[in-house]
Amino acid sequence: MLAGIREILIIAAIDETPKCERLLGDGSQFGLKLSYAVQPKPEGLAQAFIIGEDFIGDDSVAMVLGDNLFYGNGLGHLLREAAKQQNRATIFGYYVENPQSFGVVEFDDDGVPVSIVEKPKHPKSNYAVTGLYFYDNRVVEYAKSLKPSKRGELEITDINKIYLENGDLDIRLMGRGFAWLDTGTVDALLDAANFIKTVERLQGIKISAPEEIAYNMRWISKRALLESAEKYGKSSYGQHLLSVAEGRILYTSNDISGIGERPRWGIESEQEKH
């Protein structure tokens, strides 16, 4: 949403897709248009572009993994810059202590990326590729051209390699102040929950609220925001939406993008959370 994207295809396993649809509906409450598709078998991240070919059409596309959490002041600006790129791909690197568990970017002495290796035994850097990707329309044909890896999957790393070899890959590093949490394990999910709890307790506001982002992007009206607040009642989430609607939350102007943020007391901005 912070990238300015309003049409979203949610791809999930056959038993999970109906649950997602019941939870999120058509997305109109967020000013979005949501569609749904099934991945019959877990045959790799790159398969998403084949499944979503009709949805993508002639457009460029972004993909984010559903079990990844990103947080940081300036995130929206980073995403919008990536979305503006034409005839290129953008991925994001993040410093980790266990690069063996991720796709890893190798850099030359000048900091230029020279290779990407999936879960290397002997990683040449500590920068992992996060679960957030922006591609031009060529990604669909690139995905179709892939052959399954040894583990029987169409690897997203192989798509990134194609863009890298063609000189069409940008790698943006998420530095200090950004948090990336991959919640693919029980322990990691607990870490993410505790992180969110801590940040929300310290700040006194929600780490992310789709209705809030939609309102600041001018995708939904104040009346729609108040209706959502009423839906959640006296819960902390409902009260947060009410505070947004009543203008009680100030926003910093660190990452102004000029794509429709509502001014608050002469300060233009948005909530830099995804």
List PLM regions with ranges:
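Conserved donor-nucleotide/metal-binding helix-loop-beta segment in metal-dependent transferases, i.e.
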Residues: G72-Q100
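Conserved N-terminal catalytic core of the sugar/cofactor nucleotidyltransferase
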Residues: M1-L65, L69-H77, K84, E227, ...
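Hydrophobic packing residues within well-ordered alpha-helices of enzyme cores
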Residues: C20-L24, A143, A192, L241
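Flexible, glycine-rich loop/tail regions that form catalytic "lids" or insertion modules at the edges
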Residues: M174, E200, P210-E212, R218, ...
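Catalytic-core segments of class I nucleotidyltransferases/pyrophosphorylases
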Residues: A62, A83, V112-E212, R223-A224, ...
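Short, amphipathic C-terminal "tail helix"
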Residues: W219-I220, L225-W265
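A structural signal for short hydrophobic beta-strand segments in well-ordered beta-sheet cores
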Residues: V105-F107
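Active-site metal-binding loops of divalent metal-dependent hydrolases
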Residues: N68, V96, V186
